[in-house]
Amino acid sequence: MTAALVAAPAAATMASGSSGLAAARLLSRSFLLQQNGIRHCSYTASRKHLYVDKNTKVICQGFTGKQGTFHSQQALEYGTNLVGGTTPGKGGKTHLGLPVFNTVKEAKEQTGATASVIYVPPPFAAAAINEAIDAEVPLVVCITEGIPQQDMVRVKHRLLRQGKTRLIGPNCPGVINPGECKIGIMPGHIHKKGRIGIVSRSGTLTYEAVHQTTQVGLGQSLCVGIGGDPFNGTDFTDCLEIFLNDPATEGIILIGEIGGNAEENAAEFLKQHNSGPKSKPVVSFIAGLTAPPGRRMGHAGAIIAGGKGGAKEKITALQSAGVVVSMSPAQLGTTIYKEFEKRKML
């Protein structure tokens, strides 16, 4: 039983009567899809939207709120092509010199937006994601932490049955192509255009890997924070496919943690798609090696339950796929550098 299953009873009790039964059924279906690593073909096709660059047109949902304002200003200063935002009831006004719209559909039609970032409080975040799906925004990045898992089960159920919109998050730092496009809350100044693709369940450990790869002179090609919740829109395998097919990405850092089976699925994916003489070096760190079973460690998805989801099992799976696993997050940069040295890639 993984974090998803642990979340199921709690989420199901949040509703009563027929709505509770419906939510329980959705939970069961989404859990099985996630457990078996299944992605509907249509949703898998949306992986291509994960790659952002200077041409990505971004809107912000929750644009005029405190968080939306602060991080939109940061994005503009970084050079992100932010083209507007939405706040219901404030359409027609301007904010930070950009137009405000009442709906995502209107914002997309008027600006040609290809991505949306969500800074909306937890009770309303799922509705914001659904609004972006309705508007067929290609990439949606939800930063919000604390969204009820029952809400996210419904969102995930819907996501897997369409192929127009790709979701990153929730409860994540976002995505960044250094020097080109920053969507989220990550500190832009530590990033440097380079050769390493980084994908992580942990926001702060992402920044650690970024800083280290910058320090050793390798830099980053694309960094994706997939978030630490049990029901998210993008997992390791989605990002790994992008990294393996991206000529600018020459090495990969994967940062996982206890709970769920995303790391094990990533290991299987790497066995199938990253072997042979042209394979790319992959370095990993798994947080929670000393975590006690049954206790949630920070993220909603970071819990060892039913004897599964432990760090040791994840490390073994990754090593069997040829991944070099660092025992310390402080050594990610030097470890990937040494792998480049071994392969004469410097």
From Swiss-Prot:
The modification N6-succinyllysine is found at K57, K66, K338. It is found in: Mitochondrion. The active site is at H299 (tele-phosphohistidine intermediate). Isoform I is expressed in all tissues examined: liver, brain, heart, and skeletal muscle. Isoform II is expressed only in heart and skeletal muscle. One of its GO terms (cellular component) is mitochondrion. Its main location: mitochondrion. Signal peptide: none annotated. CoA binds at T64, G65, K66, Q67, K90, I143, T144, E145. NCBIfam families: PRK05678.1, sucCoAalpha. HAMAP family: Succ_CoA_alpha. Heterodimer of an alpha and a beta subunit. Different beta subunits determine nucleotide specificity. Together with the ATP-specific beta subunit SUCLA2, forms an ADP-forming succinyl-CoA synthetase (A-SCS). Together with the GTP-specific beta subunit SUCLG2 forms a GDP-forming succinyl-CoA synthetase (G-SCS). This is Succinate--CoA ligase [ADP/GDP-forming] subunit alpha, mitochondrial. It comes from Sus scrofa.
